[in-house]
Amino acid sequence: MYVVIGASGNTGHVVATKLLNDNKKVRVIGRNSAHLQPLTSKGTEPFVADVTDASALAKAFHGADAAYVMIPPNITSPDPLGHSNRVSDAIAAALQKAGIRNVVALSSNGAELSSGTGPIVGLHNLEQKLNQISSANVLFLRAGYFMENTLGQANAIRQMGSVASPVRPDLKLPMIATSDIGTAAADALLHPATQGKQTRELLGQRDISYNDVVTIIGKAIGKPELKYVQVPGDQFRGILVQMGMSGTMAKLLVEMTDAMNAGKIHALEHRAAQNTTPTDYETFVAEVFVPAYRQQAAA
């Protein structure tokens, strides 16, 4: 039995689907049974639980051989790091109680740092807590910058006529599709090779900048003149709050961006076959961004 946290999300859905396709028994954990229905209809066992509830998670993990764990985002929380720490505490306690032997945990570039990285601090804390479970083999997948983070640009292009972000336009980022993270996690669960605690970075197909993003998106949507605007952090924070994010979460995201711009958050591994994933940004734009952009334009 395999257990997947965040199964209705971008990475967890892929993990669960890959495991099912390999004819494995899969238990999926989510906050809402309706969100789990697409996977339940394919044969997974649903388990509705609050991820801050260690007792409930221990029941969900009971009898399982391996688990995929992550901290589901909660962008409206007034205390995002406090929330992520409660999730980490619950996951660690539940894994230990259930005696799970093999664990794959979603983390991030920059998780080696204990402060100054915005929400990534929560992933640092998750790693520290899972490191204390002596009985479990844990693989931390430290992923790069999600390509999905650029989906919000569809609205920016429609409203402002440009791509806008506080990220430096020339900053090369290891952008990765979340589907590739899910595939890597599923493979690690199906073919466990971790002894003790290990870290593996996932750096996408190549490093690209927001200047590259603008060029690729502009070509794909028929706007080759599309420009990039670097937005000041304070202005960006206000935009995020307008969109429904808590002020604290918006502040943390600006802190993360500042750390990226300063070179504080970066890959520790040299790019190699093991940390390079197949989906390039051009494919992501064609298959994910352009449909989202057109759907917004038609709304």
Residue ranges and their predicted role:
Residues 1-27, 31-38, 52-55, 62, ...:
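Oxidoreductase cofactor-interface core, primarily capturing Rossmann-like NAD(P)-dependent enzymes
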Residues 43-44, 138:
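Short, conserved active-site loop motifs that form the nucleotide-linked donor/cofactor pocket
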Residues 49:
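Cofactor-binding loops of NAD(P)H-dependent oxidoreductases
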Residues 84, 88:
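Aromatic/hydrophobic pocket-lining residues that form the small-molecule binding cavity
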Residues 220, 234-299:
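A hydrophobic C-terminal alpha-helical subdomain
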